[in-house]
Each structure stands twice: as structure tokens, then as C-alpha cells.
């Protein structure tokens, strides 16, 4: 008797779930040419950086000497060549160390400096088309690979599109007419979640916090003023001239409290130094590393970065340029970003907020199915939770439950500062006054709202138009097949975009499914295979 084919109709059903867990001899190569970025003045951040609630409180039992290199958390030294993108090399190295340290990548991970450099200055838009009109224009004759970057712009790029793998975007592309599409820009494997500015200057006052961040995450991002004649013959650097400018970015990967002050050409007053990973190749210093005195006055903009795997994540955002110099102060009022849902089968799982404040308490509210995008609260209050700004930088806030988003509707992320506290939030804004780089924002499709009395006012209008750096992070749930025809006795495997769930067949007399998603035809007819993870059911 001829076997009849079975057809499984798979349709996606999503319900709201609990929390989603997102998951010393100096050897200088005579041929090396140290390349730095254009000098920039440090801008002191007046906001106090440390706080008893910060994620990385320094502990008093830190050892006198530590090296992430010796512990296997640091990738190999690279050479930026003639390009001025030291910042990209430092950022990628810090990310690689974080991912290795936290078991999210192997020790041979290699992230693309070329991808980060190119898309910092060549925005192509985003998968939701919310930033398609935003442009960054490099006016410097050095071009995008040589113009350098403000360290505060680095965290913005890392949280906007993230980091790709070197294999897809090798560094050779930078000097060979690199180009790309929207799909390329967001073809990234890792995304920054939190960025914590430990200190903008005066690093001697923050030694314990810097050490703790290195110990926790493998390394930190930092900048200083490079001046060649201050490198000593013991892999050392100390500039006794008090500099308040920067021109080079590096990663700090360790420390030694007893590094002798006599190892420096110009002696500081005390022993102690940071172990620095550079980007001038292994021919510089001690296989690419050197020691910098704790007393180096130009050392600043020290950041600790956290990352997550960019696994089926979506980013709703309006801030398409990396303009680092705009922020908005909010007190006794609410702000909101309203987004239109343009994809199927998405759940809102987290919110990302850029802030120059720290320790500010606020209410976070999510409204869905808005009747009017110009009124962020004219919808269903899906969640409300009390939060506190943890970082000067980007703050990744996990929602207490996932929010199902319906294609074609609008949802709002509303932030309400508490107790009269001032929230100084990062913002994007058109600025064509800079010498090397100009930022142009397209506000035409944006709903960035400020509450004024009982009314909500669009912020993307008028002479002071701006865009709040508030992002909605979603997770898309999919199966590798939406239907299948299966003969009795045959098997095929279904694969879900989320692991850790359970499979179920609505009619086991027609088909069974095992714990690995293998579906086997048993009898004639139709049935539905359902997969459930963290309370989310799709089939």
C-alpha cells in the first residue's frame, strides 16, 4: 500500500514569559612606525564616577601583581599599520578578553577592526529602517581610517551595531576600497550591553576600580598622550609633563604595584605600573606590550565593557550617528522613545539607555499597542519596574518579563526619573561644526517624546532637535521549518532559535518528537509540533 505523505502546519504562537537570561626587556623593531590618532583634549566629566551601587566595586584583597596575558585571557598583538584606528584595535582586544574570560568564545577569537572602523563613519541604516537617513561625514583628508575617534563614540558604535568576525571583514579591506550594505553592518556576532566609564582622568584615584575591572573582565579600554621620547629601555612609559590631551588608545591587561620607578627614563615618585597591550605589532616593546606608570597624567577615559552574543537580537533605535557630545538633562518629567513594530514574532526583552548620570532612580515603563505614537502612554501598560542608572555609559536593563510585540503596532519605552533627581541622558544630534567629522540626523520618522505638563512634545523638531539614545532590544523566535511533509517511518529535525526548551506533539499517533526536535512520522494525518522555552510557546 502506497504511503501517504503527512503535512505539519507550523504557526508561531508567542506568550509572555519571565526573565530572559541572555544568555622586561625593551625590544623595539627599527622598522616599526607608531601611528596614533589626532590629538584631542580631555573633557572632564563632572559627574562622580564611583558609587556604592556600581557593578564592579573594588575589593581590598586585590593582589599586588596580575596579568590577564599570563592567565590566557588576552589575544595576540596586532599591528594597525599606517591607519589611525588604534581605538578599534583597543576596543576589539577588550571585547575578545571579555568573551574569553566569561567563556563566551575560544582563545582564538578574532574580531574585525576593519568592520568597526568602517561602520563607525559609514552608516547604512538598520534592519528596521529607523536610522537609514542618519549620516556621518568625514571631512578630514585622513579619511575614516585615519581620522581617529572620540573614546565616547566607541561605546556608541559597539552598542549600535556591535562587532563582526575578522574572517568576514579582514583588516586588508580598509586600504582597498572597503564598502558594504546594511546587512554587512549588522552582520555582527557580539553586542555591547554595558559600558562603564571608570574615570575620565586622574586615574591614580581609581586604581582599585581599574584593577577590579581588569580582574573581572580581562582588560579595560583606555587612552593617553603618546610621545615617543618618553619610552624607556625597560618597556616603560612615563611622561613627566602634565598632559591633558589624548592621541592613542590601548587596552590595560594587568598591573604590578612593585614595578620599579627607576625603570622609567623620567622617574615618577612611586613604584607601580599598568601592563599595556599596544597595536603596533609584536616588534614594539616586549612582544607588543609595555609598562605605564601609575602616575601617567595623560591616562584617561578608562572604560569597562560588557558584551553579549548577538544571537537573534533586534535593536530598535533612532540614534544612527556616533556623535559623542550631545546629552539632555531631564528632571521632574518623563521622556520616551516610541517605535513601530515592523517584524513578526518578536519579544521585547531588554532596554538600553545611555547616561552621563549615575545612581539616578527611575521608573521604566513599557506601553504596547499605542493608539497614537505621539502619546507614549495611550496604550496597554505591559510592564513597570523600578531601576537605577548603574553606569556613566550604556546601561542594559533586562525586563522582568518578555513583552510580545505585534507587527504593525507601536510600543513606547518610557523613563520617569524619581525623587527630583536629574537624569543626563545621551542624545544624538546634527552637528556640522566639527573640523574632522560632521553628524547629520534625519528626525523625520522618529518619535522621541518629552512630557510637558499633560502633553507630549516631539524632540525631533525645531533648532534644538535631538534623539534620545534609548534602544529596545528584542529576541526573534523561529523554527528552521514552518511546515514539512513526512512519510510514515521517516524523521526530520526541527531546530529552534532558542535552546533549553521542550518539544511536544499535539497528536502522537500521527507524529512523535524527541528532546532534540527529531520528528518521526507514525500515522496518517496532520498534527502540530510545539516548542516551549521560558514560558514562550511556538509551534
Indicate residue ranges for each PLM-predicted region.
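Sec-dependent signal peptide cleavage junction
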Residues: 19-30
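Predominantly the structural core of cysteine protease catalytic domains
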Residues: 28, 62-71, 81, 88-93, ...
Amino acid at each position: 500500500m502506497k504511503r501517504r505523505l503527512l503535512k505539519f502546519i507550523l504557526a508561531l504562537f508567542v506568550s509572555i514569559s519571565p526573565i530572559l537570561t541572555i544568555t622586561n626587556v625593551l625590544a623595539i623593531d627599527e622598522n616599526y612606525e607608531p601611528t596614533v590618532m589626532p590629538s584631542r583634549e580631555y573633557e572632564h566629566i563632572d559627574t562622580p564616577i564611583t558609587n556604592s551601587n556600581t557593578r564592579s566595586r573594588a575589593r581590598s584583597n586585590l593582589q599586588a601583581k596580575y596579568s590577564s596575558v599570563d592567565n590566557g585571557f588576552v589575544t595576540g598583538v596586532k599591528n594597525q599599520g599606517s591607519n589611525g584606528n588604534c581605538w578599534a584595535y583597543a576596543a576589539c582586544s577588550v571585547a575578545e578578553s571579555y568573551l574569553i574570560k566569561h567563556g563566551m568564545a575560544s582563545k582564538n577569537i578574532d574580531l574585525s577592526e576593519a568592520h568597526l572602523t568602517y561602520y563607525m563613519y559609514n552608516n547604512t541604516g538598520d534592519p528596521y529602517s529607523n536610522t537609514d537617513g542618519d549620516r556621518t561625514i568625514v571631512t578630514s583628508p585622513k579619511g575614516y581610517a585615519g581620522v581617529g575617534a572620540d573614546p565616547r563614540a566607541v561605546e556608541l558604535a559597539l552598542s549600535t551595531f556591535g562587532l563582526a568576525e575578522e574572517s568576514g571583514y579582514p583588516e586588508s579591506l580598509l586600504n582597498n576600497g572597503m564598502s558594504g550594505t546594511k546587512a554587512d553592518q549588522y552582520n555582527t556576532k557580539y553586542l555591547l550591553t554595558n559600558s562603564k566609564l571608570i574615570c575620565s582622568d586622574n586615574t591614580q584615584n581609581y586604581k582599585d576600580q581599574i584593577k577590579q575591572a581588569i580582574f573581572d573582565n580581562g582588560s579595560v579600554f583606555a587612552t593617553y598622550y603618546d610621545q615617543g621620547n618618553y619610552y624607556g629601555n625597560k618597556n616603560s612609559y612615563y611622561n613627566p609633563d602634565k598632559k591633558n590631551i589624548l592621541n592613542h588608545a590601548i587596552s590595560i591587561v594587568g598591573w604590578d604595584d612593585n614595578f620599579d620607578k627607576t625603570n622609567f627614563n623620567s622617574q615618577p615618585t612611586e613604584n607601580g605600573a599598568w601592563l599595556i597591550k599596544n597595536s603596533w605589532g609584536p616588534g614594539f616593546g616586549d612582544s607588543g606590550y609595555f609598562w605605564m606608570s601609575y602616575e601617567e597624567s595623560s591616562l584617561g577615559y578608562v572604560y569597562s565593557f560588557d558584551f553579549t552574543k548577538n544571537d537573534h537580537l533586534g535593536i530598535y533605535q533612532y540614534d544612527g550617528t556616533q556623535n559623542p557630545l550631545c546629552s539632555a538633562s531631564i528632571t521632574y518629567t518623563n521622556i520616551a522613545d516610541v517605535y513601530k513594530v515592523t517584524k513578526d514574532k518578536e519579544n521585547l526583552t531588554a532596554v538600553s539607555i545611555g547616561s552621563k548620570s549615575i545612581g539616578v532612580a527611575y521608573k521604566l515603563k513599557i506601553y504596547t499597542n499605542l493608539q497614537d505614537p505621539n502619546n507614549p502612554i495611550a496604550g496597554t501598560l505591559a510592564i513597570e519596574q523600578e531601576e537605577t542608572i548603574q553606569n556613566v555609559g550604556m546601561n542594559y536593563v533586562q525586563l522582568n518579563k518578555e513583552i510580545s510585540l505585534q507587527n504593525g503596532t507601536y510600543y513606547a519605552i518610557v523613563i520617569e526619573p524619581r525623587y527630583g533627581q536629574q537624569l543626563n541622558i545621551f542624545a544624538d544630534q546634527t552637528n556640522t561644526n566639527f573640523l574632522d567629522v560632521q553628524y547629520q540626523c534625519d528626525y523625520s520618522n522618529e518619535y522621541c517624546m518629552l512630557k510637558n505638563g499633560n502633553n507630549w512634545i516631539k524632540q525631533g523638531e525645531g533648532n534644538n532637535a535631538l534623539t534620545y539614545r534609548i534602544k529596545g532590544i528584542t529576541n526573534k523566535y523561529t523554527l528552521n521549518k514552518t511546515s514539512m511533509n513526512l512519510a510514515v517511518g521517516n524523521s526530520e529535525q526541527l531546530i529552534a532559535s532558542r535552546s533549553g526548551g521542550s518539544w511536544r506533539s499535539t497528536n502522537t499517533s500521527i507524529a512523535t518528537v524527541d528532546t532534540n526536535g527529531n520528528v518521526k512520522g507514525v500515522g496518517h494525518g496532520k498534527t502540530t509540533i510545539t516548542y516551549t522555552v521560558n514560558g514562550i510557546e511556538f509551534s
